[in-house]
C-alpha cells in the first residue's frame, strides 16, 4: 500500500458486471475514474471533499420549500394573531385621522410664511442646534379635499427655521394618532397582555416610534419619495445638495432601504413584534421572558422567509431585516434627542407623546 493513501479495503470498488445494459461502458468508466481520483487523495483531502458534498447537499435542501418542516402550528398562530392585530389597529387609508391641525396653506401651492418667530437671546444657542438638526430637511405637506381641491404647505425658502414651528402642531397630531394605533396593536397580542403592566409600559416607551416607522414604510412610495397617508401626503424637499444629499438623512435612507426589500405583510408585523419585545429597553423587569418572546418571533420570521421566499435569492433576507431593526434603534435614539431639544425651546408634544418620551413639564 502506498504511504498516505487509504487502505484498499476502505473503498468499495465498482463491479463492472453491475453496469450491464445500455450505456454501461460510460457509467463504468466514470465510476472507475471517480475511484482513481479518491485513491490518489490523502485522508484529509477525502474528508474535506465529503464535507463539501454534505454542505452542497444542505444548500440544495435549503433552496427548496421546507414543506412539512415549515411553520409550526404555534408559529402560524402567532402570525395570525399579529396580522389580526395589525388589521384592527392600523388605519392604512388614514380615513379616521380627522380634526388635525394644519399649518398655513394655500390652494395655489405658493410658499407660505411660517407662523412663528425665531427665538432670540439666551435661547439662540438652543435654536442654532435645532436649525442644524432639522432645517436642512424641509417637510412638504399636501392635503386633498373631498371636493378635489388640493392644499399645499411648502417651507420657506430662507433658513430661518420658523416654518418648523408652524408644522409642529400637525406633526404632533399625526404622531399621536399613530402612537395610539401602536399601543392598541400591542394590547391585542396575548403575550404582551400577559406581561406585568410596568413591563408593558417600558416596552411601549421604547418601541412605539420604531413600530410607527415600520408602519409608515408600508405607505412609502419609493418612486416619488412620498408617504401617502390617505388624503394627506408628505415628502422632504430637496436640500441644497440635491437628492443625493437628502439620502444621507437617516430616516429617509432607512425607508428607501427597507422598501427595497419588498417585504410581505407578515414580515412587517413580525418586525413590529421583534421591535416591541426588546428585552433591553430601560425599565424592563422580566428581561428573560421578553427575550424568549423576541426569539420566538425572530425564529418565526426566519422560518416564514425560508418557507415563502425562493432560495437562494433571499437567503440573506432575514439578516438584512435584523440589520434594519438595529439601524432603526439608532434612529430612534437620535429622534428622541431632537424631539427633546425642540420641546425644550417650543413645547408642542401632546400628553401621550410626553408620556412615551418621558417629557416632564418645566
Language-model features, listed with the residues they occupy:
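Intrinsically disordered, low-complexity regulatory regions enriched in Ser/Pro/Thr/Gln
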Residues: 1-362
Amino acid at each position: 500500500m502506498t504511504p498516505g493513501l487509504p487502505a484498499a479495503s476502505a473503498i468499495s470498488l465498482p463491479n463492472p458486471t453491475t453496469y450491464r445494459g445500455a450505456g454501461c461502458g460510460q457509467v463504468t468508466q466514470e465510476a472507475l475514474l471517480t475511484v482513481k481520483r479518491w485513491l490518489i487523495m490523502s485522508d484529509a483531502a477525502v474528508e474535506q471533499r465529503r464535507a463539501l458534498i454534505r454542505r452542497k447537499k444542505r444548500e440544495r435542501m435549503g433552496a427548496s420549500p421546507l414543506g412539512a418542516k415549515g411553520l409550526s402550528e404555534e408559529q402560524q398562530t402567532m402570525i395570525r394573531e399579529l396580522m389580526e392585530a395589525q388589521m384592527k389597529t392600523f388605519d392604512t387609508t388614514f380615513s379616521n385621522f380627522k380634526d388635525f391641525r394644519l399649518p398655513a396653506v394655500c390652494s395655489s401651492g405658493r410658499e407660505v410664511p411660517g407662523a412663528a418667530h425665531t427665538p432670540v437671546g439666551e435661547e439662540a444657542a438652543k435654536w442654532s442646534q435645532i436649525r442644524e438638526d432639522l432645517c436642512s430637511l424641509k417637510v412638504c405637506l399636501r392635503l386633498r379635499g373631498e371636493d378635489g381641491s388640493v392644499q399645499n404647505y411648502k417651507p420657506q425658502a430662507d433658513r430661518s427655521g420658523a416654518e418648523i414651528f408652524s408644522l409642529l402642531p400637525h406633526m404632533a397630531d399625526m404622531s399621536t394618532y399613530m402612537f395610539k394605533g401602536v399601543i392598541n396593536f400591542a394590547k391585542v397580542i396575548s403575550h404582551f397582555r400577559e406581561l406585568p403592566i410596568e413591563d408593558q409600559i417600558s416596552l411601549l416607551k421604547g418601541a412605539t416610534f420604531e413600530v410607527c416607522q415600520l408602519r409608515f414604510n408600508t405607505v412609502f412610495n419609493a418612486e416619488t419619495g412620498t408617504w401617502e397617508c390617505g388624503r394627506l401626503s408628505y415628502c422632504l424637499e430637496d436640500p441644497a445638495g440635491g437628492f443625493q444629499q437628502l439620502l444621507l438623512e437617516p430616516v429617509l435612507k432607512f425607508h428607501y432601504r427597507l422598501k427595497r426589500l419588498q417585504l410581505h405583510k407578515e414580515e412587517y408585523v413580525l418586525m413590529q413584534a421583534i421591535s416591541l419585545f426588546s428585552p433591553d429597553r430601560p425599565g424592563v423587569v422580566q428581561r428573560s421572558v421578553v427575550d424568549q418572546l423576541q426569539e420566538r418571533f425572530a425564529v418565526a420570521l426566519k422560518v416564514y422567509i425560508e418557507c415563502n421566499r425562493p432560495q437562494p435569492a433571499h437567503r440573506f433576507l432575514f439578516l438584512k431585516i435584523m440589520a434594519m431593526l438595529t439601524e432603526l434603534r439608532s434612529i430612534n435614539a437620535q429622534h428622541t434627542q431632537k424631539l427633546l431639544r425642540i420641546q425644550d425651546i417650543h413645547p408642542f408634544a401632546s400628553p401621550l407623546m410626553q408620556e412615551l418620551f418621558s417629557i416632564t413639564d418645566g
